[in-house]
Amino acid sequence: MSPLLPSFPFAVLALADGSIFHGFSIGAPGETTGEVVFNTALTGYQEIITDPSYCSQIVTLTYPHIGNVGVNAQDAESDRIHAAGLVIKDLPKRVSNFRSEAPLDAYLTEAGVVGIAGIDTRKLTRILRDKGAQSGAIVAGKAGDDYETLGKKALELVKAFPGMAGLDLAKVVTTKKPYEWREGEWDLHGPNGTPAYRTLDTSKPTYKVVAYDFGVKRNILRMLTERGCELTVVPAQTSAAEVLAMQPDGVFLSNGPGDPEPCDYAIAAAKEIIEAGVPTFGICLGHQIMGLAAGAKTLKMKFGHHGANHPVKDLDTGRVAITSQNHGFAVDASTLPANVRVTHVSLFDGSLQGLAWKDKPAICFQGHPEASPGPHDVSYLFDRFMELMNAAKKEGK
């Protein structure tokens, strides 16, 4: 345990099964509730907690040392922290990275996010693995507060959290109005030799793409931009008619938090766009929405997939890729219609990971080909989307 932590106020994590963990507050004072999940990634803690897909979730990071490199503005995947809370084992006393702008605990405090450190994250992860993701609460006290009082309060809060099933959180995290995106990938040799994100040459865009924001990560937009996409990002509830009126070369459906089934507005829009023959690509929640639009069903997973080391098999090539994953729901392969085929499966549990339409230019993937954090083994899926748009252009659609 870091020598810094004992000087911090007490904090308590309580689970719905009655488990209580004692630790120290590393964020804002107060309380938070959410679904407690674990992420096995060794790096990328800032990208993880700023991923909108973690809205209403308390994230447990299994790697013991979190905060080593601090945080900076460039690595955030959205405009703020979306995780409901953070659980870690050890907060280093010092950060060590030339890009660091602030320590993790200061970042959490400034954002008003509750965090806890100093607990046995291995024990917590085993509970979540064996019993499944469950509701939880963190109560971060002030100087003088005791564990018994904080624990009782945390257990009361857990009972009030409704769980993730049935929650439409895409409406919560989506942009309020459309915007243009022109930022590309990170360039170590940017202007004047200074590292910076590249900017799309708008005088020569290759594809006009409309991106639905259900909680989109910035690195997804960057990877699309890098391939010549002139992006218009639209709110989650934008109708298919509005999107089709823009005459896009392709439509992208983003990642996002919560249960896909309540997103009836998005399911209806996706169905109409796919039926119109517009090349369509979905990731994560977007993948689930496309599955529902095809007529399939989704199911709640026991503890989901959260990490950067998940092996996935591409059934078209036979190749295995290591992927970044972050989802608690999945498309039920047994409910797929005849015109949709499975393209990828998880080698951890056999769950469905990718789909392709036999009669339409539409593909989707459950994991995160943009990584951030994680490997880029399946970044070729972005290229497949470009191929679909190229083919549609040649056909004059």
UniProtKB/Swiss-Prot annotation:
User: Could you tell me which InterPro entries the record lists for this protein?
Assistant: Anth_synth/Amidotransfase, CarbamoylP_synth_ssu, CarbamoylP_synth_ssu_N, CarbP_synth_ssu_N_sf, Class_I_gatase-like, CPSase_GATase1, GATASE
Q: Where does L-glutamine bind?
A: 53, 256, 258, 285, 288, 326, 328-329
Locate the transmembrane regions by residue number. none
Kindly provide the name given to this protein in its UniProt entry: Carbamoyl phosphate synthase small chain
Catalytic activity, per the record? hydrogencarbonate + L-glutamine + 2 ATP + H2O = carbamoyl phosphate + L-glutamate + 2 ADP + phosphate + 2 H(+)
**Where are the residues of the annotated region CPSase?**
1-204
Query: EC number(s)?
Result: 6.3.5.5
